[in-house]
Amino acid sequence: MFSNSNIGLLLFITHTLSAITVGILLGLLARLKHKLKNNIFAHSYNSSTNELCTFNNLGSILSNAILESSKTIIMIGGFVVIFSVIISILGNSKILEIFSYLLYIPLKLLNIDLSFAKPIISGIIELTNGVLLVSSVTSKAISFNIIICAFLLGFGGISVLLQVLSITSKSDLSIKKYIYGKLLQGIIAAIYTYILINLIPMFFLNL
């Protein structure tokens, strides 16, 4: 994407740190809201052990696992293709450009080039195409490109959120909490990226 191993290492470090940070913050928040019962882990362990004891057909379990994983891979590929087509349609119809006007004021306040507006909207919709567009923008400092990419990689985009929703829809997991967590991860990843670029010489990429 940037053809620079230092940038790849930088994004890896910041996203690892941001994921850990979000995990710690959400864990602390959950402890504040709910008092954990002493026997909850024992109950979960016993129930899972009982379920494992009822599985007699290993071949059936493996075939079902392979089938479900294959379906998931096809589904993810389908989401990427569909959202790539959507971005192309929105771009050709100038609708994407209209949406990009919403970012003009925030970008001006942050002293970021307005040419990032359309790529950011694309990245919010679909991650892969968005980060490629952001990385290709010519700006006064490449650090802007990297920080924006860090945010988009942390957030994941609407396409990724819908992929997760399609997988977790049959569970009791809260998609709202996941969205808030991903948004928080994107913001924290961008902050960590800014800090590392300005504090560590090997990541000083403003030149």
Give, region by region, the residue ranges found by the protein language model.
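Catalytic cores of large soluble enzymes that bind and process phosphate-bearing ligands
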Residues: S5, L9, I13, T54, ...
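C-terminal transmembrane helix pair
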Residues: M1, L11, H15-I24, K140-L207
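Short, mixed-charge, low-aromatic patches
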Residues: A19, G23, N56-L62, K118-S122
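Transmembrane helix-loop junctions in multipass membrane proteins, especially transporters and channels
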Residues: G27-N39, N92, L96, T138, ...
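Conserved, well-structured core segments that form the ligand-binding/active-site neighborhood
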Residues: M1-S47
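Transmembrane alpha-helical segments of multi-pass membrane transport proteins and ion-pumping complexes
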Residues: A19-R31, T72, I76, V80, ...
